[in-house]
């Protein structure tokens, strides 16, 4: 792992070397000129999927950090700087690395960057993570099919592993769970660990699970996904095993 600075930019890479063109790796225009953009997804901003397996060992997802809500309309992507390790991209990078090393199915962090403003008070942030191949989020799948009992149980076990590490996923919802079609069968992945972190005690775990259930119930009405109380019961049974 290598951490370094170039002018007003700070980088961390999951490699034991620096890169002269490090800035370009976080610019969508660079990858477009290289004809290496293989897809994109819309959220708060655009996540670009990149053909980088020959460079980084895996294909990547490039994401810029944007604010949401009313504040985001006034200040779309600048955050107050206090310490490098607590910046949005560096914090998510380190958390993903911790979970990846613990064996949880999360994207491997590849690199992160922050760029300070002229006064050094604020910064903008970007992150490169592993692209999970042959995968869709649960809401997309559940619009067209039901999922087997074992898949719901797998989700329950995954969340339990996360909670046993005392990690609170602050945006745990159906869109942040991917289902991958792998050789060994279906595999669940967790995404988007921005603003997530360690939390003591157990009181928040039920709230976290309730948040996930509400997200499924919301998408039943909004996207007509196929989700039942029995699905949730299967998930919870595995969680409590």
Curated annotation (Swiss-Prot):
Membrane topology field: Peripheral membrane protein
Pfam families attached to this UniProt entry: Kdo (PF06293)
EC number: 2.7.1.166
Presence of keyword Cell membrane: yes
Reaction catalyzed: an alpha-Kdo-(2->6)-lipid IVA + ATP = a 4-O-phospho-alpha-Kdo-(2->6)-lipid IVA + ADP + H(+)
Subcellular location(s) of the protein: Cell inner membrane
InterPro entries registered for this protein in UniProt: KDO_kinase, Kinase-like_dom_sf
Keyword annotations of the record: ATP-binding, Cell inner membrane, Cell membrane, Kinase, Lipopolysaccharide biosynthesis, Membrane, Nucleotide-binding, Transferase
A molecular function GO annotation: ATP binding
Primary localization class, coarse: membrane
Source organism: Haemophilus influenzae (strain PittEE)
SUPFAM superfamilies (alphabetical): Protein kinase-like (PK-like)
Family according to the record: Belongs to the protein kinase superfamily. KdkA/RfaP family.
Described purpose of this protein according to its UniProt entry: Catalyzes the ATP-dependent phosphorylation of the 3-deoxy-D-manno-octulosonic acid (Kdo) residue in Kdo-lipid IV(A) at the 4-OH position.
GO biological process, one term: lipopolysaccharide core region biosynthetic process
GO cellular component, one term: plasma membrane
Protein name: 3-deoxy-D-manno-octulosonic acid kinase
This protein's record includes keyword Nucleotide-binding: yes
Pathway: Bacterial outer membrane biogenesis; LPS core biosynthesis
Active site annotation, chain numbering: 171
